[in-house]
From Swiss-Prot:
ATP binds at G30, G31, P32, G33, T34, G35, K36, S37. This is UPF0273 protein PF1931. Residues 3-247 form the KaiC domain. Gene3D superfamilies: P-loop containing nucleotide triphosphate hydrolases (3.40.50.300). The keyword tRNA-binding does not apply. GO terms for molecular function: ATP binding. Keywords: ATP-binding, Nucleotide-binding.
Length: 247
């Protein structure tokens, strides 16, 4: 039996036929505004509610901003940080300014993937993490796309070895067909793609599970909403040819 990690996102575990297989590294790919960060933060928060410690690696936003964004959905992680159940890895500020006073885990040189991995590994050990989010992994190879797959594989080796189940947020530009970075889709166990499409003059959100090692899953494109409590996915609805149909 494959052990599964529940995302806890309403509707999502149904689409994944029970959740993400344990130790999988999932690429969460999408354009701007599709809800990638919210999805990954909700995954971590729900883990905390299930007693699974988690780590958020902030590469795109200041850690303070990330905490504020999460708190807007009612996901206040500070208590869990104090209890040693949640850790933020600051890979955004490089320790410039006030961060070095109150962030425990700081990556100073993003071009040094070994430093990045060492800081992450330390954080995982310290809190015995079960879930890890890297937001976004694209930042690690934005200036050296040829390294994308190699970087993904290095990270995956470390994370799977520690027993963590992970989400790598991957940015793609509007209308781009791939998953962000050459070959990255071959280096991961799963791919979930979030989309925002203009249909009849209105933006509609949908997601599709492109692949997921270790489990069957829905092959359909499902609509989802972002509410004040986070993401809700509709497993009983499908988006096709611009229209939403009940299954």
């Amino acid at each position: 039996m494959v052990r599964r990690v529940k995302t806890g996102i309403p509707g999502m575990d149904e689409i994944l036929h029970g959740g993400i297989p344990e130790r999988n590294v999932v690429l969460l790919s999408g354009g701007p505004g599709t809800g990638k960060s919210i999805f990954s933060q909700q995954f971590l928060w729900n883990g905390l509610q299930m007693g699974e410690p988690g780590i958020y690696v902030a590469l795109e936003e200041h850690p303070v901003q990330v905490r504020q964004n999460m708190a807007q959905f009612g996901w206040d992680v500070r208590k869990y940080e104090e209890e040693g159940l949640f850790a933020m890895v600051d890979a955004f500020t490089a320790g410039v300014g006030k961060s070095k006073e109150y962030e425990k885990y700081i990556v100073h040189d993003l071009t040094d993937i070994r430093e990045f991995i060492e800081v992450l590994r330390q954080a995982i050990r310290d809190i015995n993490a079960k879930r890890v989010v890297v937001d976004s992994v694209t930042t690690l190879y934005i200036n050296k796309p040829a390294m994308a797959r190699s970087i993904i594989l290095q990270l995956k080796r470390v994370l799977a070895g520690t027993g963590c189940t992970s989400i790598f947020v991957s940015q793609i530009s509007v209308g781009e067909r791939g998953f962000g970075g050459p070959g990255v889709e071959h280096g991961v166990d799963g791919i979930i793609r979030l989309d925002l499409d203009e249909i009849d003059g209105e933006l509609k959100r949908s997601l599709i599970v492109w692949k997921m090692r270790g489990t069957s899953h829905s092959m359909k494109r499902h609509p989802f909403d972002i509410t004040d409590k986070g993401i809700i996915v509709y497993p009983d609805k499908v988006l096709k040819r611009g229209r939403i149909y009940e299954l």
